[in-house]
C-alpha cells in the first residue's frame, strides 16, 4: 500500500514524490501521459528563476537552483551514474511599463529580504547594460547575474 498518491507527474508532482521518498514514504504518481510525450512540463522551456513577487516563490526558486547544481550527486544511480540537468545559466531580464512599475518596486523589497541578488535598472538606463534591447515604454527592469537563473532539460526529471 502506498503512503502517498500524487495526481500529476509534472515538476511539482515529481519533486514532491522525490522528497517524500527520501523521507522513507512509499509514493505513487498517477500521470495521464506516462510517456510524457504530451505532458506540459517536459514540453516547457524548463526555466528556473527567482524573480517573483511572493517571498515563498523567490525562496523556492533559490532552492531549485541549488538542487539543480547538486543533481550529479543526488540523482546518480547504477543505471545513470552521471545525471545532468543540462543547465544553461543565462539570467533573466524582466521589463515593466509604468502600469506595473510600482508593483515591481514592492516585489524588489521581497527580493532584498530573500537575498535574491536581483538588480534594478531604470528603463532610461537599460540600453547601457543591454544595448540590444529596445527600452521604449519601459519604466523599470530587473535582472540577475547569469549564474542564478536560466533553464534546464525538463525531460531529465522524468528519466
What are these regions (language model features)?
Residues 1-4, 19-23:
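Extreme N-terminal leader/targeting segments of oxidoreductases
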Residues 8, 31, 96-97:
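Short beta-strand/turn micro-motifs composed of small residues
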Residues 45-129:
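Dinucleotide-binding Rossmann-like beta1-alpha1 core, especially the glycine-rich loop
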Residues 21-41:
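Glycine-rich FAD pyrophosphate-binding loop
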Residues 144-159:
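Helical element adjacent to the flavin cofactor pocket in flavoenzyme catalytic cores
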Residues 1-12, 28:
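Beta1/beta-strand and adjacent pyrophosphate-binding region of the FAD-binding site
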Residues 39-45, 132-136:
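Short, flexible, mixed-charge acidic loops at enzyme active sites
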Amino acid at each position: 500500500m502506498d503512503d502517498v498518491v500524487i495526481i500529476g507527474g509534472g515538476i511539482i508532482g515529481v519533486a514532491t514524490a522525490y522528497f517524500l521518498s527520501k523521507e522513507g514514504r512509499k509514493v505513487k504518481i498517477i500521470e495521464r501521459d506516462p510517456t510524457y510525450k504530451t505532458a506540459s512540463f517536459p514540453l516547457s522551456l524548463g526555466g528556473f528563476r527567482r524573480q517573483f513577487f511572493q517571498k515563498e516563490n523567490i525562496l523556492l526558486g533559490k532552492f531549485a537552483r541549488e538542487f539543480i547544481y547538486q543533481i550529479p550527486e543526488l540523482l546518480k544511480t547504477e543505471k545513470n551514474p552521471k545525471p545532468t540537468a543540462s543547465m544553461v545559466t543565462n539570467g533573466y531580464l524582466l521589463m515593466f511599463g509604468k502600469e506595473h512599475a510600482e508593483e515591481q518596486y514592492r516585489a524588489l523589497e521581497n527580493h532584498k529580504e530573500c537575498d535574491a541578488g536581483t538588480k534594478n535598472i531604470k528603463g532610461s538606463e537599460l540600453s547601457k547594460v543591454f544595448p540590444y534591447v529596445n527600452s521604449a515604454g519601459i519604466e523599470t527592469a530587473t535582472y540577475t547575474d547569469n549564474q542564478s537563473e536560466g533553464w534546464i532539460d525538463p525531460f531529465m526529471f522524468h528519466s
